Amino acid sequence: MKIALDPYMFRSTPLAELPGLVAALGYSAIELSPREDFIPFYKHPRANTADIRAFKASLKVAEVEVVTLLPLFRWAGPGEEARQAAVRYWRRSIQIAAELGVPEMLSEFNGGPADPAECEALFWRSMAELLPDFEREGIRVVIEPHPNDFIEDGFAAVDMIRGINHPLVSFSYCAPHTFYMGGDIAGITEYAGDLLTHVHVADSFDFRGSSGLRYIVNIGAGGGVPNGITPPRIHQHLDIGQGEVDWDTFFGTLKRLQFDGVMTVCIFAWEERARESSVFNLQEIRKRMPGAA
């Protein structure tokens, strides 16, 4: 099992300096999430050949590897034009991953819950177009359900990935999304079985708690949700132990399943103490998963 850091809280750090920073924090692997100067959210990648070469050189010096590249594009819409653009962005991102020697790419179902059938149709179209690219480069694509995607439930997400029926497509369990996935950590991860190749580590509060009043969000007059708009999804990416994720069940189930994939620390909540947070969560994982690299 490899422990990686999503360095999103350090995104202002120049890319060439990032591997050294990650190594100084005690990590040897990076999950590279969107950066404006490399692969931005929902836009065409910015990285050119010189950028990639410089980044590879800095990775080598720091003895750090990129184990996962995480792009986010609208491959499930909304709309065909957005989907086609997303496929173009994906293809360039796959090229970048291949040039970096990254073995897997991680993303979300995307789309939205307001029209799940339409989003699913667009998603299948994108997968049909992109699978040959993943096959050509030998890169795994790992998918997780995210709050406000067209699929949010963990069991439904596993069923969808199983239905893709491709050896290069697998499932990621994102701990801070636990409560939108249905709350059953052991059930979902066991149901995924061999499809579970990646997990995200961060804590979150249970939005369902206290009769649904854990969070109170006022939208417009009277606090109602306008027609055609789904309620807001609220979650956090906190340090282990700061929320309500059942970590004994999470780590205990992964041990029982003999999980041997990528475990990424993806804390977003504490930019003012990003270094301390990154070190703390690495120590917590090593304490709970002895032998993890």
Task: Describe the function of each predicted region.
Residues L18-E36, G101:
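Catalytic domains of carbohydrate-active enzymes, especially glycoside hydrolases
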Residues K2, A29-I30, E36, A128-E244:
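Acidic/histidine-rich catalytic cores of soluble enzymes
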Residues A16-E17, R53, A57-A62, W75-Y173, ...:
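Active-site acidic/histidine proton-transfer and metal-coordination neighborhood
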Residues M1-I3, G26-S28, K60-V67, L100-P103, ...:
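Short, well-ordered coil/turn segments that N-cap beta-strands
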Residues M1-T13:
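Boundary/entry segment of secreted carbohydrate-active catalytic domains
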Residues L5, V22, I30, L59, ...:
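Conserved, mostly hydrophobic/aromatic
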Residues E31-K56, N110-D115:
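Glycine-rich, proline-tolerant flexible connector loops at the mouths of alpha/beta enzymes
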Residues A274-A293:
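C-terminal helical cap(s) of enzyme catalytic domains, especially alpha/beta-barrels
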